[in-house]
């Protein structure tokens, strides 16, 4: 699975692993420590977002 998220800079980011939820901050935290807003989860074999293929 792949995860689409929006980072603090407003950029869409694709993650291979799930961001973790930090209950103290009430936020999703990405692998690199940035707070993100999760937008979707996708099967790795069919990567599309808003009907457009996602390039990795």
Q: Model segments located where?
A:
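A short beta-strand micro-motif
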Residues: 2-7
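Short, surface-exposed terminal/edge motifs of secreted or surface/virion proteins that either
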Residues: 11-23, 40
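Low-complexity intrinsically disordered segments
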Residues: 25-56
């Amino acid at each position: 699975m792949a995860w689409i998220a929006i980072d603090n800079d407003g950029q869409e980011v694709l993650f291979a692993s799930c961001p973790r939820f930090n209950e103290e901050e009430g936020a999703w935290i990405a692998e690199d420590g940035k707070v993100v807003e999760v937008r979707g989860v996708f099967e790795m074999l069919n990567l599309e977002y808003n009907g457009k293929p996602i390039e990795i």
